[in-house]
């Protein structure tokens, strides 16, 4: 077997952390990765910018172009290499990506893989749900204020994956724009309790603990909330989740802010559209 030639990790083995750091131009120093070079080399940055501006470049102006193309290692060469790599992927999107070599998640409890026994108490939640909801708890406010899709799926292991996408609605029901995004996991425990971890796109991570209220209702409250400096000042939350007699997924979420006690934040009733 011929040994791999040139820089870069051995293609027959996974790259080491040191190899990856070298490829992206960094090294581990004092417990952190620090840059060792600028990924866009400065010897032709101005030349590349000028080329983009007027569609041409003159090697006499200090650029890295030669009669045979960009000088290897120059900024021009890096740009050209990136363009060539993009040719194979520029027309593709998420839906075009080949499937993973492992079973896909399912939101249908009748499909394989089977639901893990630990998740049986949460079985009614598994599915794809879509509907509308409202903010707060204003008297007389009955018009939907947002739309929402919730996907609760599994891969046969003892947890459920949770994803929520919402969109804001105008008073006439038309779409106003995108709303909140959440991803997380339900993790049922041997003692019957439930952990729910939720990450919010607005810069917050919540850890809920709770228990079943019945065979089709669950109550949870936050034990910990982490926020980035730019996130809303939410300091706690509760969620009551249940399946209604007519088969909808319904919930009420309360939130507490740094200067406001727990109060209703959102509520919705979602129809099962898959699962």
Language-model segments: which ranges?
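Central antiparallel beta-sheet cores of small beta-barrel/beta-sandwich binding domains
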Residues: 139-230
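Acidic/His-leaning functional-site neighborhoods
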Residues: 205-257, 265, 273
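Residue-level recognition of well-ordered beta-strand positions that form the cores
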Residues: 128-134, 163-165, 197, 221-223, ...
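Amphipathic/hydrophobic helical signal segments and adjacent flexible N-terminal regions
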Residues: 2-50, 55-159, 246, 258-275
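Short secondary-structure boundary micro-motifs
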Residues: 105-106, 112-118, 134-137, 168-171, ...
